[in-house]
Amino acid sequence: GMYPNNGESPLDLSNFPNCKAVVDVIYNPLKTRLLQQAEQLGMKAVNGLEMLVAQAKFAVEHFLSTEIENDKIDQITLELLKQLTNIVLIGMPSSGKTLTGKALCKYIDKTVVDTDAVIVERSGMSIKEMFARHGETYFRQWEHDVIEEFSKQNGLIIATGGGAIKNEENIQNLKQNGVVMFIDRDLEHLLVTDDRPLSKDTNAVAKLYEERYPLYTKYGDLRVPNNYPMEISQQELDELMNTILEGYHEILCHQWA
């Protein structure tokens, strides 16, 4: 499961019912499929990043005849996690994922990628046009391929399309290097727009909301309420960004490190 062979796993942990913990010395991706399955089965899962840092610490001590405090291992590991781990945004169409992603990159040193925008740029078609010409299945394959590509990278803010959560493999890919944030906007605040093929009227939006909300809550590592007005004030924007960043750092400290 090491890059570039992400998604592969040497074994199925369901065949080891007495297993309590799994250590995978791979650190690229940060969570291999093996570690993801371990977490799903309630096992302790540890990657190889801390071991890499510890190895470097002892190598420096040996070759430079110096001493480094052991707590530096944890500090450096956490700093690396902050640099490497992606922030992934999921949620309903018009929940604010794209705008949140663009704003967030001004608060943290990461590059924003909007998967729908990448699809439009590379295909030469709008999402609406792609649906009309080729259907949803064709679009979902594009979406899968773009997510698969960017989820292998590090240091990104990835804003996904509203339906990305329909394919569990998308979530597995996004979680291998990312913390998933569910941008949760109440139904009455979601917009109906003609350029969104699956949410072009109020009834369609309500149906999507009912179908997808359980998936957003299932896959999100953190739920981020976003009922701020479209013309958001700087104070409100700061509040939203702080909620995301505090949650992100909390997850890195307690679930990843």
Pin down the residues of each PLM region.
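A glycine- and Lys/Arg-enriched "phosphate-lid" helix/loop adjacent to the NTP-binding pocket
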Residues: 177-215, 219
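Conserved glycine(s) of the Walker
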Residues: 96
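ATP-dependent small-molecule kinase phosphotransfer cores
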Residues: 114-172
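Hydrophobic anchor at the beta1->P-loop junction of P-loop NTPases
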Residues: 89
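Adenosine-phosphate binding glycine-rich loop
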Residues: 21, 25-85
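P-loop (Walker A) phosphate-binding loop of NTP-binding proteins
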Residues: 92
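NTP-dependent small-molecule kinase module
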Residues: 74-83, 99, 103, 107, ...
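Rossmann-like adenosine-cofactor binding region
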Residues: 1-45, 164-170
